[in-house]
A protein has these predicted regions:
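PLP-dependent amino-acid enzyme catalytic core
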Residues: 1-182
Length: 187
């Protein structure tokens, strides 16, 4: 790395590009195929760019301020990114995971200071799972109700419906790919 950074957010996305020479040879390709090694992001999560972008978008809209609590459902990757950036920006994070998610992911989340819940800790979700009425929308609504019921400001970042999640790639991925290749345009 050629520069000194002052916060973890400055490290996001500037991950190495690697030419996939073996793949090119195996498939007799004339074009170069590049892979972006996203696991080199600061938290080790491939979702760091999206997690940071969702937090930045919420801050810009005035939906988050230091001391607030972010809530999200995660299987791990987005949650790990959210945990890293929540900690560095002065937010608390509570994540809800499906039963059976790896202990290692839970430990990483906790190491960043996140509180980890299992989705069935929400009684209405446990009931919906048991009686067969569970849907993703029901779960999203239950998480929003959980946030609304808290005595302090809780913000459901809602990666599934948050435009800043895919927006991270429209806004940033092309830049992070085209700058090191000096092409300006990738096809």
């Amino acid at each position: 790395m050629s520069k000194i950074v002052t916060n973890i957010a400055e490290l996001v996305g500037n991950t190495p590009l690697m030419e996939l020479v073996g793949y090119e040879k195996k498939h007799d390709l004339k074009a170069k195929v590049l892979g972006k090694l996203e696991y080199f992001n600061p938290s080790g999560s491939i979702k760091d760019r999206a997690a940071l972008n969702m937090i930045l978008a919420a801050e810009e809209k005035g939906l988050l301020k230091p001391g607030d609590t972010i809530v999200e459902n995660t299987s791990g990757n987005t949650g790990i990114g959210l945990a890293a950036f929540s900690a560095s920006r002065g937010y608390k994070l509570e994540v809800f995971m499906e039963p059976g998610q790896s202990i290692e992911r839970q430990q990483i989340l906790k190491a960043y200071g996140a509180t980890v819940h299992i989705m069935t800790d929400l009684p209405e979700v446990a009931k919906a799972l048991a009686d067969g009425t569970f849907t993703v929308q029901f779960y999203q609504d239950a998480l929003q109700r959980y946030c609304d019921a808290q005595p302090t400001h809780y913000y459901f970042i809602n990666q599934l419906a948050n435009e800043a999640n895919p927006g991270a790639h429209y806004d940033l991925s092309l830049i992070h790919i085209s700058e090191p290749t000096r092409l300006g345009m990738i096809s």
